[in-house]
Amino acid sequence: MTKSYEMVYILRPDLLEEQVQQEINRYRDFLTENEAQEVQIKYWGKRRLAYPIKKLQDGFYVQMNYQGDGKQIAPLERMMRLSDEVIRYLTIKLDKDQYTPNDSPPPEGIIDTPKPVIEPPKPAVESPKPAETTEETAEAVETVEPPAEPAEPVEAVETVDTTEETVEPVDTTSEE
């Protein structure tokens, strides 16, 4: 029975694009030779690591989705563990509803290179739109309500110094 798997691995940042391409092809070819089906590769590019791994700050991220019977996982992970180019890898088994294969097979080489999306920061408070005419501005000024009156003033509170100790004299002569 075939199951869906997802593997993400990180390659060393000092590799050239040709070497990254060779590593991706090496692992893709290994999967196809070992009866994995619908191998899809997504190249995420060079990204900053969340924390240093082997004194490295960056790495090339690659995601592979495939279907197989599970016998490909151990040899593939062994290849990655022995490789000097792979600094980290993780394989997970996907549920049936998580895996959605593409209708067409992926082309050779690095595919699905995402473009970084840079959105301008949104202002904390939206600025009012400028008035189109001066008449509207005059009307807007007239409709502005004055600020509400503050609540009744609070009366002054008397502070009491409680640091003094009140000591009552003790009668040491006791009559029994």
From Swiss-Prot:
Gene Ontology MF, one: small ribosomal subunit rRNA binding
Q: Looking at the UniProt record for this protein, which Gene Ontology cellular component terms does it annotate, in alphabetical order?
A: cytoplasm; ribonucleoprotein complex; ribosome
Q: Which Gene3D superfamilies match?
A: 3.30.70.60
One of the Pfam families matching this protein, by short name: Ribosomal_S6
Q: Transmembrane segments in this chain: where?
A: none
**Which terms does the UniProt entry file under GO BP?**
translation
Keyword Ribonucleoprotein attributed: yes
- Biased composition of type Acidic residues is found at 161-176
Alphabetically ordered keywords of this record: Ribonucleoprotein, Ribosomal protein, RNA-binding, rRNA-binding
| Ranges of Low complexity composition bias in the record | 140-160
Give the start-end ranges of region Disordered. Answer: 97-176
Q: Which PANTHER family match?
A: MITOCHONDRIAL 28S RIBOSOMAL PROTEIN S6, SMALL RIBOSOMAL SUBUNIT PROTEIN BS6M
Q: Its function?
A: Binds together with bS18 to 16S ribosomal RNA.
Regarding protein family, the annotation reads: Belongs to the bacterial ribosomal protein bS6 family.
Please state what the protein is called: Small ribosomal subunit protein bS6
- Protein species of origin: Gloeothece citriformis (strain PCC 7424)
